[in-house]
From Swiss-Prot:
It comes from the Eukaryota. Residues 78-89 are annotated as: C. Residues 119-122 form a propeptide. This is Insulin-like growth factor 1.
Amino acid sequence: MGKISSLPTQLFKCCFCDFLKVKMHIMSSSHLFYLALCLLTFTSSATAGPETLCGAELVDALQFVCGDRGFYFNKPTGYGSSSRRAPQTGIVDECCFRSCDLRRLEMYCAPLKPAKSARSVR
């Protein structure tokens, strides 16, 4: 013998199915495609580990971050620094062999040049 379900359960199932049919009818195939694409990129980026930047990708990232200022491959040192320095790590050590973020990339940007003031000509 079959199991008899209660009237409230049957009404809930019926209303829920009708609700889903209406929602699926309203949602076009392009909406479903974009939703699937968003879910796919979200899940793949959430599972991806830290990435490294090497070669042309590193140069492109530095050009993007630093813009017209330019950049250095080694951290700039101040004037009059001692000749007995500790070995420096460069951007390749920090971003190619290990992963780095935008703040780390910005540390290798050249400083902003002061704006040229207009001279008075006599």
